[in-house]
């Protein structure tokens, strides 16, 4: 796949950045609708986004670099080069949520009211953003047979044929799962008024899908022999169950 979308003069604009931007824009449009459901201020949401989005990008990059530091030790300037990928979503979620918590505490606004509204937008952005991995030929799984990959559309087959071998399109599996979760979260946002349930459902459901999909990937970040994303996913599932149980109980 050609990772370059177009050029502006001598500057190459990559699909990775274009797709992340599209995901963010569509997430904001969805949030406009969801703010009306919860009667939350969209202006406040925009302010929150302007803090959360750059914080998430920084967090996603730092998280990735920490676990792959050997690749940057001899050329530290490359730490700042994200144009070819190298963003870890768990780092983005952690930094983004932390930034939002600090901002909303300063503004004396309800944290769970706004992250509930944000949850469908976040997972929508993740669903779209995974296609950036497709154009970068990354975040794929292990080798598969031609017979297996032939069940997918031709452009997926072409994109997953890398250096003479077909690979699991794990980016696609996660994208589809995230779209399904997004639809469910919008439904849940309409059905429940209990603050925190939608956001914690997002954490739990995303973690559930990511745990299984991560087992197929070939580019996992490791802590010893443990896949970090699977470890974080297990913690996310446990945390979401604990919080949802307590929210419903109280």
Swiss-Prot record:
PROSITE patterns: LGT. The keyword Transcription does not apply. The keyword Cell membrane applies. Its main location: membrane. The chain crosses the membrane at residues 11-31, 49-69, 84-104, 109-129, 169-189, 196-216, 228-248. It is a multi-pass membrane protein. Pfam families: LGT. Keywords: Cell membrane, Membrane, Transferase, Transmembrane, Transmembrane helix. GO terms for biological process: lipoprotein biosynthetic process. It is an enzyme of class 2 (transferase). InterPro entries: Lgt. Pathway: Protein modification; lipoprotein biosynthesis (diacylglyceryl transfer). It is found in: Cell membrane. Its EC number is 2.5.1.145. A 1,2-diacyl-sn-glycero-3-phospho-(1'-sn-glycerol) binds at residue 130. GO terms for cellular component: plasma membrane. GO terms for molecular function: phosphatidylglycerol-prolipoprotein diacylglyceryl transferase activity. Catalyzes the transfer of the diacylglyceryl group from phosphatidylglycerol to the sulfhydryl group of the N-terminal cysteine of a prolipoprotein, the first step in the formation of mature lipoproteins. NCBIfam families: lgt (TIGR00544). Belongs to the Lgt family. This is Phosphatidylglycerol--prolipoprotein diacylglyceryl transferase.
């Amino acid at each position: 796949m050609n990772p370059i979308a177009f050029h502006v003069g001598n500057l190459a604009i990559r699909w990775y950045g274009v797709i992340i931007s599209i995901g963010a824009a569509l997430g904001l449009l969805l949030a406009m609708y969801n703010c009306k459901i919860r009667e939350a201020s969209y202006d406040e949401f925009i302010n929150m986004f302007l803090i959360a989005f750059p914080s998430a990008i920084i967090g996603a990059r730092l998280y990735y670099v920490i676990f792959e530091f050997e690749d940057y030790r001899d050329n530290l300037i490359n730490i700042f080069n994200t144009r070819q990928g190298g963003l870890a979503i768990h780092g983005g979620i952690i930094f983004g949520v932390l930034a939002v918590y600090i901002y909303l505490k300063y503004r004396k606004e309800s944290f769970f009211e706004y992250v509930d509204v944000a949850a469908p937008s976040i997972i929508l952005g993740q669903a779209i953003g995974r296609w950036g991995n497709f154009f970068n030929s990354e975040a794929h799984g292990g080798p598969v047979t031609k017979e297996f990959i032939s069940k997918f559309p031709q452009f997926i087959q072409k994109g997953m044929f890398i250096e003479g071998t077909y690979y699991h399109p794990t980016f696609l599996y996660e994208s589809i799962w995230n779209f399904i979760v997004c639809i469910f979260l919008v439904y849940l946002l309409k059905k429940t008024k209990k603050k925190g349930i939608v956001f914690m459902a997002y954490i739990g459901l995303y973690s559930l899908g990511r745990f299984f999909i991560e087992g197929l990937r070939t580019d996992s970040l490791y802590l010893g022999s443990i896949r970090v994303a699977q470890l974080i996913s297990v913690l996310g599932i446990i945390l979401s169950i604990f919080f949802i149980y307590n929210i419903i109980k109280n």
